[in-house]
């Protein structure tokens, strides 16, 4: 299969892309930097095709995914600086990336009939449960901006 992986400059996207390539899949990575800027560890992701992409730009998302023409998109891109996300001057940007950018990816995948996997976080819950979460648990209680915006991303995908 051919995958398009967003956020390959980060830890999760880097590892997801490496695992896909290790298993013999083809992949194109993306992140906001002009060129791959993740860990320079010589792993396959560092040599894989790369597309610079700002997921908050709907037209750019559509152009990139259309041109790559993947069988599936694995959406790992996100604002992940949890503490910095709480800064008043950062909240709109965090929401634009984690909710709006995710909505853009979901909309384009739906339009192109392309499978999409969205990676969220346990920060959508408050961590005060006494039992493991059950599949499709909807007991959301985000306690910070990061968790709230990732939940907004989950809901964007679910409602697209």
Model regions and ranges:
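Rossmann-fold NAD(P)-dependent oxidoreductase module
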Residues: 15, 19, 108, 156
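Conserved glycine-rich Rossmann-like NAD(P)H-binding loop of the short-chain dehydrogenase/reductase
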Residues: 22-38
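Catalytic helix-loop patch of NAD(P)-dependent Rossmann-fold dehydrogenases
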Residues: 92-104, 111, 124-160
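Rossmann-fold cofactor-recognition segment
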Residues: 43-58
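Helix C-cap/helix->beta junction micro-motif
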Residues: 23, 68, 108-112, 160
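N-terminal Rossmann NAD(P)H-binding glycine-rich loop of SDR-like oxidoreductase domains
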Residues: 1-23
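SDR active-site strand-loop-helix element
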Residues: 6, 30, 73-77, 116-121
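NAD(P)H-binding glycine-rich loop region in Rossmannoid oxidoreductase-like domains
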Residues: 55-97
């Amino acid at each position: 299969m051919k995958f398009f992986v967003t956020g390959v400059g980060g830890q999760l996207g880097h590892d997801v892309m490496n695992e896909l390539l290790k298993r013999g899949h083809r992949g194109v990575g993306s992140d906001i930097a002009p060129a791959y800027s993740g860990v320079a560890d010589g792993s396959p992701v560092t040599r894989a095709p790369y597309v610079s992409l700002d997921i908050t730009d709907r037209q750019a998302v559509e152009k990139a995914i259309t041109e790559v023409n993947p069988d599936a998109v694995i959406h790992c891109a996100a604002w992940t600086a949890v503490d910095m996300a709480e800064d008043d001057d950062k909240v709109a940007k965090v929401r634009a990336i984690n909710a709006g950018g995710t909505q853009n990816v979901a909309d384009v995948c739906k339009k192109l009939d392309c499978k999409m996997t969205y990676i969220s976080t346990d920060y959508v819950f408050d961590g005060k449960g006494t039992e493991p979460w059950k599949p499709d648990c909807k007991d959301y209680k985000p306690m910070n901006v990061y968790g709230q915006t990732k939940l907004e991303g989950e809901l964007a995908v679910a409602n697209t």
